[in-house]
């Protein structure tokens, strides 16, 4: 008996239990669909399953079962759609970031001469309205992304994450969709009655989800970049939150002192702002401090910076949590520390 057309015939009532057993045994044939013949179900198998007396089933051959159509992955469709030299297709990136309907791509230099055609292929398959080339990271305290638009129209978009709508222009302001787990954690970490100070609010990455899901008494959101500040205000409006007070300017000048029950420092080069954070903290406060740190210094440098800042301010500090979020660059990680000040 050949193996390519093997099926197991079983009564309808026993079919689902048998199908599960065959799948667990690795015998279920994924290339053919299950069929019906009157009161019986025909389950395709890749080899003889052995004794099936417990199911009152029999094994036979049947070449009439419909084959499953092969499903191409989005990347396979992109490779097929790209109108470039066949020899260049091996350089197409298999990873990308979708921010709303704007696509952000990192392209190797080999694709520099055909990047418009490449962008069009990705956009057509993924449904993007515009494509940005990531030219490596962000710049300065304003956290301006280094990108170039290579295809499409307007880059302003609305990105949905964890039930929150973020309006932004990823060509002008930073956004990382890969930080969703940390945003989800922070969204629910505050307590009713708290005053939260977000020293680097951006477009509201942490402040807006926290306002929606945790509902603290007040969130004071500081942002130095006027473009990001515009979107911070817009995101408070479109998500209908009223407990956020946006403040435009350097947080060292704008953040009120002695008021915070919780402080968020989401800027990865915030060491120079720690003295201000100590002044912003109320008598008891929790600090969430982010840093881009060389891997060999993760266990020492960030916590040492916090302890030294607390000592200068005459404060006590307790480490609650140190967590590596993701790789930031070769040999460098994005970490976050939760600490309690008293």
Question: Which residue ranges define each predicted feature?
Answer:
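SAM-dependent transferase fold signal centered on methyltransferase-like domains
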Residues: 1-342
């Amino acid at each position: 008996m050949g193996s390519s057309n093997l099926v197991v015939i079983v009564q309808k009532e026993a079919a689902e239990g048998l199908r599960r057993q065959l799948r667990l045994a690795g015998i279920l044939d994924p290339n053919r669909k299950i069929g019906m013949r009157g009161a019986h179900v025909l389950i395709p198998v890749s080899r003889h399953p052995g004794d099936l007396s417990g199911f009152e089933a029999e094994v036979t051959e049947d070449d009439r079962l419909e084959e499953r159509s092969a499903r191409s992955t989005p990347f396979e469709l992109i490779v097929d759609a790209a109108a470039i030299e066949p020899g260049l297709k091996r350089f197409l990136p298999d990873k990308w970031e979708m921010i709303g309907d704007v696509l952000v791509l990192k392209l190797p230099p080999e694709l520099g001469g055909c990047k418009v055609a490449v962008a069009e292929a990705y956009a057509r398959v993924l449904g993007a309205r515009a494509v940005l080339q990531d030219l490596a990271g962000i710049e300065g305290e304003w956290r301006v992304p280094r990108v170039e638009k290579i295809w499409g129209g307007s880059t302003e978009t609305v990105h949905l994450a964890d039930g929150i709508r973020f309006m932004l222009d990823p060509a002008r302001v930073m956004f990382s969709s890969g930080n969703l787990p940390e945003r989800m954690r922070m969204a629910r970490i505050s307590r009713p009655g708290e005053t939260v100070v977000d020293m680097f609010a951006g477009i509201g990455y942490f402040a807006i989800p926290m306002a929606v899901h945790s509902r603290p008494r007040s969130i004071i959101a500081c942002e130095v970049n006027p473009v990001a500040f515009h979107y911070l205000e817009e995101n408070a409006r479109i998500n209908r939150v009223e407990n956020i007070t946006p403040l435009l300017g350097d947080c060292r000048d704008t953040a009120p002192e002695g008021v915070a029950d919780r402080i968020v420092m989401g800027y990865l080069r915030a060491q120079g702002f720690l003295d201000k954070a100590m002044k912003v903290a109320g008598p008891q406060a929790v600090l969430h401090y982010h840093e881009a740190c060389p891997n060999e210094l993760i266990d020492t440098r960030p916590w040492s910076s916090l302890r030294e800042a607390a000592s200068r301010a005459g404060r006590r500090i307790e480490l609650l949590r140190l967590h590596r979020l993701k790789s930031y660059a070769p040999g460098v990680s994005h970490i976050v520390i939760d600490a309690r000040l008293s």
